[in-house]
Amino acid sequence: MADALASQLSNTTLGEANSETKWKEQLNVPAKDARPQTEDVTATKGLEFEDFYIKRELMMGIFEAGFEKPSPIQEETIPVALTGRDILARAKNGTGKTAAFVIPTLERINPKSTKTQALILVPTRELALQTSQVCKTLGKHLGINVMVTTGGTGLMDDIIRLNDAVHILVGTPGRVLDLASKGVADLSECPTFVMDEADKLLSPEFTPVIEQLLSFHPKDRQVMLFSATFPLIVKSFKDKHMRNPYEINLMDELTLRGITQYYAFVEEKQKVHCLNTLFSKLQINQSIIFCNSTNRVELLAKKITELGYSCFYSHARMLQQHRNRVFHDFRNGVCRNLVCSDLLTRGIDIQAVNVVINFDFPKNAETYLHRIGRSGRFGHLGLAINLINWEDRFNLYKIEQELGTEIQPIPQNIDKKLYVYDSPETIPRPISNPPQLRQATQSVTAERRHQNHANSGQYQFNRGRGSYRGRGQGQRRSVQNESNKFNHPQGQQSGKSQMAPVS
């Protein structure tokens, strides 16, 4: 009898262990991203997500989103954040900072409570949409409600949604303060206060708003700050509003290891022609092209379209619904090139971007660092090319000195191994894509690759009506003056047939 009972107990234990190991096999895990990664994300302690002892439902969302192992910033942050301690974390762009604060935030949410339990602040509307989607995706098995609120949208819609339970509120500071001041967003029992891109949120334009928002939170709140750059203003905020924060600094160097940086000296009137040459010579999966003003964004997008390349543009003066559409379509691979202002330098994660071009060279090292960080995401390879005129040479030297890096002159031929992947169709698209859209995107990408690699491997771009997307509401007074700068020199025509050296 005793032997039979022992045998039964033994079998039961084995059955439970079996189910413990089988739950992973039943998950709908995406195809593994086989691209090589740099030490920015591979230099870990060897921890697994299971080592954090988080809820199984949360781990299910993590693995179904394509996560395999925690990155260095996640290894350092998650265990400390789970204890409720304040955190000041600094890590490179594209190394997994968002998941580093989203995972512990989700773990500490009580879905049975109807109160708002976490506030995540970001500086831009696009980043708010992206962060809220990460929260929804990783927490999809937890029964948690996530709401995103930003300026440029109707306030009444937000008021109606806040009548229901909202566990995590993601938004931009101005809109959240508006809702809190009106008593619509109740933050009195919200113990978690997160700031992503904290250096931007603590700039003079945002700091008063941030401090007002903190007054709506309980005194025993947890404050977490994340960014790639921390100016002196962050220290004063830390001393004033944080309690013995745990400081994490993984910035042994400022630039990402996987990004190759070049510059090309060109006259202002030659820039469009040089860009045309780059388009014809580079093997671009997706590219982001940065300009220093709203007017130049629109003018350059128009020029690129006239050259025959598909192009979207985005800047802060566009209607919010237009910005959202451009951002959504570009992330989903509808268009190959995006021209934008510094609106999209913060936190935007588009895995398919392998080339960043600074059509206008930035004025400071911080902006430069965030711009080039749009390629080479999560330890992958990327290419950053800077078009430099005579006036930019001092900024080039200054940025090299501040970042401790050397930007090389562009060679006649760029090695494709530095930024091109063997199978770009396997690059993960946004984790929110429904299967039908993902399949459609992959089929379009495959068709494009077939066309682009025809003609002896010469990489050509798709044409298409309506590719010049998103007419903004920017000021037009100086458009004619800016447009003159883009004109080609006499006797020189634009177009793919014209080739010129880029250095």
Curated annotation (Swiss-Prot):
It comes from Aspergillus clavatus (strain ATCC 1007 / CBS 513.65 / DSM 816 / NCTC 3887 / NRRL 1 / QM 1276 / 107). It is an enzyme of class 3 (hydrolase). Belongs to the DEAD box helicase family. DDX6/DHH1 subfamily. Residues 7-18, 434-445, 480-497 have a biased composition (Polar residues). Residues 78-248 form the Helicase ATP-binding domain. One of its GO terms (biological process) is mRNA processing. GO terms for molecular function: ATP binding; ATP hydrolysis activity; RNA binding; RNA helicase activity. It catalyses: ATP + H2O = ADP + phosphate + H(+). Residues 1-38, 425-503 are annotated as: Disordered. Gene3D superfamilies: P-loop containing nucleotide triphosphate hydrolases. It is found in: Cytoplasm, P-body. The Q motif is unique to and characteristic of the DEAD box family of RNA helicases and controls ATP binding and hydrolysis. Keywords: ATP-binding, Cytoplasm, Helicase, Hydrolase, mRNA processing, mRNA transport, Nucleotide-binding, RNA-binding, Translation regulation, Transport. Its EC number is 3.6.4.13. InterPro entries: DEAD/DEAH_box_helicase_dom (IPR011545), Helicase_ATP-bd (IPR014001), Helicase_C-like (IPR001650), P-loop_NTPase (IPR027417), RNA-helicase_DEAD-box_CS (IPR000629), RNA_helicase_DEAD_Q_motif (IPR014014). A motif (Q motif) lies at residues 47-75. The gene is dhh1. Its main location: cytoplasm. CDD domains: DEADc_DDX6 (cd17940), SF2_C_DEAD (cd18787). One of its GO terms (cellular component) is P-body. This is ATP-dependent RNA helicase dhh1. A motif (DEAD box) lies at residues 196-199. The keyword Transmembrane helix does not apply. ATP binds at residues 91-98. SUPFAM superfamilies: P-loop containing nucleoside triphosphate hydrolases (SSF52540). Residues 258-418 form the Helicase C-terminal domain. SMART domains: DEXDc, HELICc. It comes from the Eukaryota.
